[in-house]
Amino acid sequence: LLNSFSANGSEAFEEIETNEKADNVKNYDFRMPKKFTKEQLKTVESIFETYARVISSYLTGLLRLYCKVEVMQIEEQRYYEFNNALPDYVMLSTVNMGIVDEDVLETSIIMQLANPITYCMIDRLMGGDGQFTSINRDFTEIEVGLMSNVMSKLAASLKQAWDPFIEVNPV
């Protein structure tokens, strides 16, 4: 009698337990984790729309040519996917965001300029007309030096865009 009661009771208990688990379980894709909520992505988009306006003004003055920078899309991407999509020669800069918050450790970002844009900017900075010609080579030391100054100013412009949300001192 006890065996039949305990056998039936354990089946009923297991059935209740699986039903409770089924209600609380959410599917999670470990291969492609989503770390940001839609609200956070909208905030990031707002920040970078402000940033686009700021650097549009900076680049227009620097290059003596009307420049319009726009946010096309915000998406999450793993670093190795980003890295694998880069061409062989690319203009990259790492920026320490200098977040003023004791709860946040050092936070760095990567800024990348597409090669056609980089070569057009270099041409304008050197007095040319900024026409793009397809170039597939590494950057010279002079080109890197010119773009280092530009990238520093672009990094410093991040402060104005991020300040309404968090105090940063990008370097």
Please provide the spans of the model-predicted regions.
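N-terminal auxiliary interaction/assembly segments of multi-subunit proteins
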Residues: 1-171
